[in-house]
């Protein structure tokens, strides 16, 4: 059927909303119009033939061909068909033929591009895709603050980050300013630029933007580039080279792809899942929007390509340099894409970056910004917040909110910051944490991020841990492996048992393990030796250390509830300088009031009123409570109105776990000859009643120069030492060491400490656990805010990562995001 042709007087192109456009004519009407006589120009001259774009809703009344590839290019005149890429970008049928027809000069260029696209990409290598990827001109913004106009570059200029950073109106391809003529900035901006900002413009875009040479490309080499917002035509996105797969269009999921490492980037930074990978904490799918992203940016739900391109770019830029705040201005030069859509990308990157900043995905950690460099726009600055507690959770939230530009006051009951982080630097050459010091799983762990920001190195623990019996004999590794296997088998049976059990059917974990163990002995007829029984007790003591409680208080149904969520993978490390380095940096420049225990929180009025025990009053719009679970359970803070029954039930369904530590410095390293460079060694308990006493001894100096050991008291043993003074605990510890190294003389320590977390009035615990009859849901309930006014953070509010400094820190980041959004 013949294409309808319209003939009329040439008109200037100007802005239209699709809603104001006339209804489309039927084919018959269009054909009739094509035969109508032509009008004449106002000056009486002959009219110029032209054709409208046939894309419904396109505002271009007189399209102009951007390609100018064919000698017969229609330019702004008549063509038999316009090909629509966006409301301001079209190419004519003559230029289409130039590349698409095999007898034309441009055909070889098109087919070469098509082969590259097909071998790397997944989407169709259509002529429109070719034009968008290879022929559309680049747009760039003048960097003069008083100008900031968008200019279309000539075809021969390839946009680079350097050009984008330095471009001024009138700049030549060699980046030199044109000879003095007129002020190029005074020239008006192209009218099409204004259209790009309209909400409907993006919906009229035929193809989503695919970034060229994205910083994210090396991290995403195992993906089809066009599925993660990148152009398949760039060498940086050459998937075949990256995966060693030369087969066009096929994606090999090799094992090597699961551990992508980019030179110069911290090996613990792995922000993107690789194909077929799962279960890695703080990882995002580069080809899928997360639920909270869809909620924030619903306009990308149908085609998320632009969002993914910009989000992936932002994440890659952040992890390339996490020591400086990432701003829109730093991202924009790396947005390399042809066409007017680059303008839209630049506009959108600001929104996306602010969202990711608020969520704590970027611009987080110990990053500190000046008063004129707040990370969020002024709309967020009109809030005031009181934070109760200066531990990792409170300081994380305070640092985030302060960086956002929100007024924050921190009230801390103790005479120091850190909460359950407290480092002892009095040992010669070694820092020993009285609280946390070990990082379990470093990949994507925010602690690893903060260490990178501070230039701190962590010591990776080795795997070797010899189990030494009282009497000095090292346990045969085959016995250790056998009992480790049996221990894990017991826990596997517990996992099977709980699958169909409700909370009402819950039993203590210790009771269930004993029941399964006895049933196994009875059914199998296997008899374990006395030593094997003792080694099993060693593994049970480690489980009590992990839970922070004796196993007869822990839920068999929910003891490892967080394992159902992605956890931190990778190395287990010792933070040799201690967590206090991080804590002090988080606190830098914040308004922190020490010795200010809070007595009452009244949130019944328009503002929250907080009163300390000495009667001092503070008021703010929001309050964040980060005190330990034990203090909430004992009602250390009075709430008005009182906390709901649901929240109090959740608070009391968790246990306030407790462990204690002992550290000892010796005149020399007496253990070296037996331990042979291992980072720790185990103590096989002589009986079940002794199993929580000094189960593992840690060598606190990775350099093996200084002579400091640290051990832990867990389970029932915590209660047994509570009535002893420090010297008596030391005597028990030394008696154990002298049994383990019976063949040699063990010297008296020159210095030591014993922690007393259970009796610290403002702490009273180590970390939380789920009590029998409870569930992991309690963590979420405790974390719920009250009326958008009272918020809660701390390890006991983090269902995914409880019991850790990491979990506490992330809960503070989470609440800062919620507070900023209200």
Curated annotation (Swiss-Prot):
Species this protein is from: Homo sapiens (Human)
Subunit record text: Interacts with its cofactor GLYR1 at nucleosomes; this interaction stimulates H3K4me1 and H3K4me2 demethylation. In contrast to KDM1A, does not form a complex with RCOR1/CoREST. Possible accessory component of the polycomb repressive deubiquitinase (PR-DUB) complex, at least composed of BAP1, one of ASXL1, ASXL2 or (probably) ASXL3 and one of MBD5 or MBD6. The PR-DUB core associates with a number of accessory proteins, including FOXK1, FOXK2, KDM1B, HCFC1 and OGT; KDM1B specifically associates with ASXL2 PR-DUB complexes.
Protein's UniProt name: Lysine-specific histone demethylase 2
InterPro entries associated with the record: Amino_oxidase, FAD/NAD-bd_sf, Flavin_monoamine_oxidase, Homeodomain-like_sf, SWIRM, WH-like_DNA-bd_sf, Znf_CW
Effect of residue 103 to D: No effect on DNA or nucleosome binding
Resulting phenotype, residue 543 to A: Reduced demethylase activity
EC number in record: 1.14.99.66
Domain SWIRM: residue ranges: 275-373
GO MF: FAD binding; FAD-dependent H3K4me/H3K4me3 demethylase activity; histone binding; histone demethylase activity; oxidoreductase activity; zinc ion binding
Outcome after substituting residue 563 to A: Loss of demethylase activity
Binding-site positions, FAD: 383-439, 598, 795, 803-805
